[in-house]
């Protein structure tokens, strides 16, 4: 029985980063898929701490909130930096990822048709901080922080991949980010995950946008 269970909708959404992390680290996990119809029946929602998914189980530990789950896996699997300085920088990166993901989710679920063009125009300004951070770490040839992969890398990689679907070419003016995505996506276990039917056949969002 896998030690980890992901309870979530049949989409990539807020779980694909943790799935990539688990796959890359050679961990097995179980998926409990909650259909929209099941969720709309209203019986599961009151049992969830914040009334939302994902729900994550690590043995007898149950967690909610996707970033809390990522940080837990980071601590558990040695993906949280070598010291407090690196850990603090990883937290900063991850919060930056969450800021942009929040903007993306708002676009997808509330204003896709009318807001996409303005969103894409503003996107370079939101991507630039990550390019800057890469440039400050080993010339952008390694990870976002330090010399070992971290939970923040998986979250950033997922964010960049979904934006490449939304706006192909969005990284063309960011050579370090472009190389970073290619480099991480080529890690054998991530490459296998990204080409797996489970990933390929899972839509990014739950409303047919992307």
From Swiss-Prot:
Chain positions with Phosphothreonine modification: 62
Extent of the signal sequence: none
Protein residues bound to glutathione: 8, 14, 39, 45, 52-53, 65-66
PROSITE patterns assigned to the protein according to its UniProt record, in alphabetical order: GST_CTER (PS50405), GST_NTER (PS50404)
CDD domains: GST_C_Pi, GST_N_Pi
All copies of domain GST N-terminal, residue ranges: 2-81
Tissue and organ distribution: Ubiquitously expressed.
Keyword Lipid metabolism: yes
EC number(s) given by UniProt: 2.5.1.18
Reactions catalysed, as given in the entry: RX + glutathione = an S-substituted glutathione + a halide anion + H(+); prostaglandin J2 + glutathione = prostaglandin J2-S-(R)-glutathione; prostaglandin J2 + glutathione = prostaglandin J2-S-(S)-glutathione; prostaglandin A2 + glutathione = prostaglandin A2-S-(S)-glutathione
Subcellular localization: Cytoplasm; Mitochondrion; Nucleus
Keyword line: Acetylation, Cytoplasm, Lipid metabolism, Mitochondrion, Nucleus, Phosphoprotein, Transferase
Modification N6-acetyllysine, positions: 128
Alphabetical list of InterPro entries matching this protein: Glutathione-S-Trfase_C-like (IPR010987), Glutathione-S-Trfase_C_sf (IPR036282), Glutathione_S-Trfase_N (IPR004045), GST_C (IPR004046), GST_pi (IPR003082), GST_superfamily (IPR050213), Thioredoxin-like_sf (IPR036249)
GO MF assignments: glutathione transferase activity; JUN kinase binding; protein serine/threonine kinase inhibitor activity
Phosphotyrosine modifications at: 4
Domain annotation GST C-terminal: ranges: 83-204
Gene Ontology terms: biological process: animal organ regeneration; cellular response to cell-matrix adhesion; cellular response to epidermal growth factor stimulus; cellular response to glucocorticoid stimulus; cellular response to insulin stimulus; cellular response to lipopolysaccharide; common myeloid progenitor cell proliferation; glutathione derivative biosynthetic process
GO CC annotation terms, alphabetical: cytosol; mitochondrion; nucleus; protein-containing complex
Residue positions, PTM N6-succinyllysine: 103, 116
Primary location group: cytoplasm
Oligomeric and partner information: Homodimer. Interacts with CDK5.
Functional note: Conjugation of reduced glutathione to a wide number of exogenous and endogenous hydrophobic electrophiles. Involved in the formation of glutathione conjugates of both prostaglandin A2 (PGA2) and prostaglandin J2 (PGJ2). Participates in the formation of novel hepoxilin regioisomers. Negatively regulates CDK5 activity via p25/p35 translocation to prevent neurodegeneration.
Similarity field: Belongs to the GST superfamily. Pi family.
Name by which UniProt lists this protein: Glutathione S-transferase P 1
Organismal lineage: Eukaryota, Metazoa, Chordata, Craniata, Vertebrata
Gene designation per UniProt: Gstp1
